[in-house]
Structure formats: C-alpha cells, structure tokens
Curated annotation (Swiss-Prot):
Activity regulation summary: Allosterically activated by GTP, when glutamine is the substrate; GTP has no effect on the reaction when ammonia is the substrate. The allosteric effector GTP functions by stabilizing the protein conformation that binds the tetrahedral intermediate(s) formed during glutamine hydrolysis. Inhibited by the product CTP, via allosteric rather than competitive inhibition.
One Pfam family cited in the UniProt record for this chain: GATase
Reactions the enzyme catalyzes: UTP + L-glutamine + ATP + H2O = CTP + L-glutamate + ADP + phosphate + 2 H(+); L-glutamine + H2O = L-glutamate + NH4(+); UTP + NH4(+) + ATP = CTP + ADP + phosphate + 2 H(+)
GO biological process terms on file: 'de novo' CTP biosynthetic process; pyrimidine nucleobase biosynthetic process
Keyword set includes Nucleotide-binding: yes
NCBIfam families reported in the protein's UniProt record: PRK05380.1, PyrG
Keywords for the protein's UniProt record, in alphabetical order: ATP-binding, Glutamine amidotransferase, Ligase, Magnesium, Metal-binding, Nucleotide-binding, Pyrimidine biosynthesis
Biological source species: Buchnera aphidicola subsp. Acyrthosiphon pisum (strain APS)
Residues that, per the record, bind ATP: S15, L16, G17, K18, G19, I20, D72, K239, D240, V241
Binding site for L-glutamine: G352, L380, G381, M382, Q383, E403, R471
Record pathway: Pyrimidine metabolism; CTP biosynthesis via de novo pathway; CTP from UDP: step 2/2
UniProt name for this protein: CTP synthase
Oligomer and partners: Homotetramer.
Length: 545
C-alpha cells in the first residue's frame, strides 16, 4: 500500500487553527474512502502534556489506550471517525527521552549522539510507526516556523521527502493574512516572509492555507502564488467562520481535496459531506435556548474544557436546543454568590486537580441539589458531589478528600491503592512524590451498570467502556452510610469495584461519573449522558418559566 504524507506547518503567529484545518482536511479525504490517520508533533520539552497546566496548554485529551495527549487529538477523533492512540502524539521531550534511554543502554554503540541524525531519525521512526495501517498520513507540526523548538521536526519532515520520494509528500503551510481595517486591505507580506523562512529550512510548500478575517480575493491569491512559488489553485482562503464544523465544506468548495488527490494520482470517489451538512443544519435549527454553567478553576483559557464544551453542543444538536455555555470561576461562588447561578438551566462541574476553588464547587452542587437544577459531575465533579452529600445530607462534616486534606478524619475520597508510585500514605507531600506524569488510572475501562438505573436506560446496555484520568477514587469502606442516605451507586468498574457512576433518585437529574464521557462525544452522535442532561435542562427551563 502506497503511503502519502501531508505535513502541515504554521507561520506568522500561533493559534491559527492547524488542528482544525488538519482534522477538516482529514474528514474530506476520509469521505473519499481513503484510510486516514493524523499525527500531532509538539515541540515542547515536556514528555507529554499530562503535567502541563490547563491554563497554559488547554485540556489533556485521553485516548483509549491511556495516552495523555494534545487537545487537537480530540478534534481528530471527532472529525475523522478514527480512534487515536499514544502513537498519534509525541513531543520533543518524548523523543529526547527515548533517544537518551537508548544511549544509556548502549544501543548507539558509542556514537556521539546528535540532533542529526539521532533525534531526526527518531522522529521519522515514530511517524512511520504510526502510519502502518493508513494510506494518507496527515502530520501537524505544532508551533510556528521560526521557533527554535520546531527545528528538529522541520528537518525530519524535510528529510522524509528525500527518503520516501517527493511525489509522496505534500507540504501545507497555514499562515495569517491580516486584514487592516483602517486601510481596508488584506496584507500578504507576512505570508511571503513566513514562506521565505520555510524555504531557508529546505521546505517548499505545495499548498498555502491563508487564514484571514475575510475571504482572500483572487487577485491577492494570485499575488501570494507568484511570490511564494505555488499554483494559484493551491492558495486556499480560510476565512473566519462561526462554527468549526463549517470548515470541511469551506475547504471542499475550494477543491483542496481534488488538488491533493491529483497530486498523489489517487483515483477515488468524490467526497460525500452529507453528514457535515446535517451537523451544520442541526447547529442552525433549534427550538429552544438554554444556559449551562461550567463551574471550574481554569476558565481563563476556555480550551481547558474544549471536549466538554463540544459535547454540550453535540447534545444540543440532538435535542434541537441551542446551548449557551457560561464559564464560571468557582472562586466567585465561594462567598455564597448564588446570583451568578440563578439563570442557569443546568450545572456541570468537570475534572480538575487541587483544592483551589473547591468550596465554590461544593456550594454550586448544593445549590443545584436543593433547587432541583440538573447537575452533571465529571471526574472531580463526581467526587465533590459525594463530599457535598456526605457533609450536608448525611451530616458527616468531616467528610473530605485526602487530595484537599491529607489528614481528614473521614476520607470518603482517597488515593487509588496499589498504583505505580502513589501507594505511599505520604504521597501528598511533594518530597515523597516520584513521578506525577503517567501515574494515574488512564484510558478505557469497563463499567457495569445497575438495572433500572438512569444510566442503564441511557446507555441501553449493561457493560460500557469509558475513558478515565484520575488518581483518587471513592473509598468503598466509608461509602455505605452515604449510599444508605439515598445517593445511589449505579455503575462500578468490573475489575476493582471502583465507583464509576452515582445518581440521586429524588432529583430531576443528578448524575455524576468518575470517567470522562466528553472524550467520546461526536457532532454526529453526541453522547447519551450529555444528550439526556441537555434534555433535562430544557425541561427545567420550561418549568422555570
């Protein structure tokens, strides 16, 4: 099977949307019956994003096999119907770590280890390893051309054209074409300079995707084509749109997929984008609008909750409801500032770490429980829902998590036992930690649902498989008293009897789960828990009115 590689780089500025562009292009090529995978190369020194602050990097997307990866992999999965693995994302730190381990073992037979060839060879090997079962491999290189961190990756993809043949490689450069409102003009000079910098590395782009506030007119695209040495048909205008799900059609309308298929000499059927037409239609046509509050601590960067926000939108599509998402800093609720919660039709508390803002989250859950507002807790959102119920309903004021209070008298939430590097009782003391990265309960795990429960009804099956990312779990030894008071466990892991889902029966909709259902939601299908949560929030609005 001939393998063709499409390398996507970015220029001028960061955050232009290379991930969305790669995912959208992948979706079009997938619709042409091509076998697609997408790889994200991140130039930072961290081994993976698992220990990076969400405020700096955005969410950590967890794959089925338990890899902690860049949030762009979430876009890849949602757009191309393909599950990502640990092979689909690697970093400079990960590559150097691998090479240094080999050096320590003596695998290089005494050679002097250098960026070229050892680091670049390791990068190429990882790319090729991930491409085994695909005939089109899209590779997104993080960062911006000109960054010192990106140089080994750019050199590696330059070499790949030599190794596998230039006819099997396309270089796409995504660049900013700014619109100067005061002059009423689009400026192409930044793109020209960015391409010049790419040429200095030895890479001639084959296609330019030009991000701009407005459509780049033909005469400007001709100018870009002339100065950047690409055909005018290969200069694609990507204007700002109000929905990422419009991007596949926008690229298709400019025949980007035709250009690529002709370049690779692929005889494949035309792309059928009917499913994307349906998504766009659902996004525009709704019967109701509701307000969902996400109570979190990382709200300064909305990307910290990217998959959760997308899953809420997907659920809205399925219910013909427009979901207005409000990001609320949990610390703003700590002084019992319930006014900011009063207009909400549903409250969601997502995953997180640390004790900052916990009081505000506890108060938000209490407000949702007492005022019959639909509540959905995810990961940490389940753990603190249990703490709130134990403190305020059961009357166990000492109930807490050892994450927030290592010496608490009633540790209803405690460290997962017998996990690598975290079985020590003094694990919460920084000096006793060995590794934080990669030491949680990660990836897909089976869960058994209780008969006659809401979750069983929604999933319509007894055994489900969902993705996890947590270091703390419910302490089963202390939970019986809480369960007797009415907080039901309706899902447990098959292997270790871990509490996975809780429900409150005397409430319109109160459900929380230890796993992360947002990672498997798609714009076409949604996710059963999110869909019913939004449905219940819609009912709450009608009742409230």
């Amino acid at each position: 099977m001939t393998k063709n590689y499409i390398f996507i780089t970015g220029g001028v500025v960061s955050s232009l949307g290379k991930g969305i562009a790669a995912a959208s292009l992948g979706a079009i090529l997938k619709a042409r019956n091509l076998n697609i995978t997408i790889i994200k190369l991140d130039p930072y020194i961290n081994v993976d994003p698992g220990t990076i602050s969400p405020i700096q990097h955005g969410e950590v997307f967890v794959t089925e096999d338990g890899a902690e990866t860049d949030l762009d992999l979430g876009h890849y999965e949602r757009f191309i119907h393909t599950k990502m693995t640990f092979l689909n994302n690697f970093t400079t730190g990960g590559v150097y770590s691998q090479v240094l381990k080999k050096e320590r073992r003596g695998d290089y037979l005494g050679a002097t280890i250098q960026v070229i060839p050892h680091i670049t060879n390791a990068i190429k090997e990882r790319i090729i390893l991930c491409s085994e079962n695909s005939n089109i491999i899209l590779v997104e290189i993080g960062g911006t051309v000109g960054d010192i961190e990106s140089l080994p990756f750019l050199e590696a993809i330059r070499q790949m054209a030599v190794d596998i043949g230039r006819k099997n490689v396309i270089y796409i450069h995504l660049t900013l074409v700014p619109y100067i409102a005061t002059a009423g003009e689009i400026k192409t000079k930044p793109t020209q300079h960015s391409v010049k910098q790419l040429l200095s590395i030895g890479i001639q782009p084959d296609i330019l995707i030009c991000r701009s506030e407005k459509t780049v007119p033909l005469h400007e695209r001709k100018k870009i084509a002339l100065f950047c040495n690409v055909p005018v048909d290969a200069v694609i205008s990507l204007k700002d749109v109000n929905s990422i799900y419009k991007i596949p059609k926008l690229l298709k309308n400019q025949k980007l997929d035709d250009y690529i298929c002709n370049y690779f000499k692929l005889n494949v059927p035309e792309a059928d984008l009917q499913e994307w037409e349906e998504v766009i239609y659902a996004e525009k046509n709704f019967n109701n609008t509701i307000v969902i509050g996400i109570i979190g601590k990382y709200i300064k960067l909305p990307d910290a909750y990217k998959s959760v926000m997308e899953a809420l939108k997907h659920a809205g599509f399925k219910n013909k409801i427009k979901v207005d998402i409000q990001l609320i800093d949990s610390q703003e609720v700590e002084n019992k500032n319930f006014q900011i919660l009063k207009n909400l039709n549903g409250i969601l508390i997502p995953g997180g770490f640390g004790d900052r803002g916990i009081v505000g989250k506890l108060l938000s859950i209490q407000y949702a429980r007492e005022n019959h507002i639909p509540y959905f807790g995810i990961c940490l959102g389940m753990q603190i829902a249990i703490i709130e119920f134990a403190q305020n309903v059961v009357g166990i004021k000492e109930a807490n998590s050892t994450e927030f209070d290592p010496q608490c008298k009633y540790p209803i939430i405690d460290l997962i036992k017998n996990r690598p590097n975290n079985s020590s009782k003094n694990y919460n003391k920084i000096e006793n930690r060995i590794n934080l990265g990669g030491t949680m309960r990660l990836g897909s795990q089976p869960c058994k649902l209780s008969a006659n429960s809401l979750s069983r009804k929604l999933y319509n099956q007894e055994i489900i498989i969902e993705r996890h990312r947590h270091r703390y779990e419910v302490n089963n030894l202390l939970f019986k008293k809480i369960e007797a008071a009415g907080l039901q466990v309706t899902g447990r892991s098959q292997k270790n009897n871990v509490v996975e889902i809780i429900e409150l029966s005397n409430h319109p909709w109160f459900l929380a789960c230890q796993f992360h259902p947002e990672f498997t939601s798609t714009p076409r299908d949604g996710h059963p828990l999110f869909i019913d949560f939004i449905k219940s929030a819609g009912k709450h609005k009608k009742n409230f009115i």
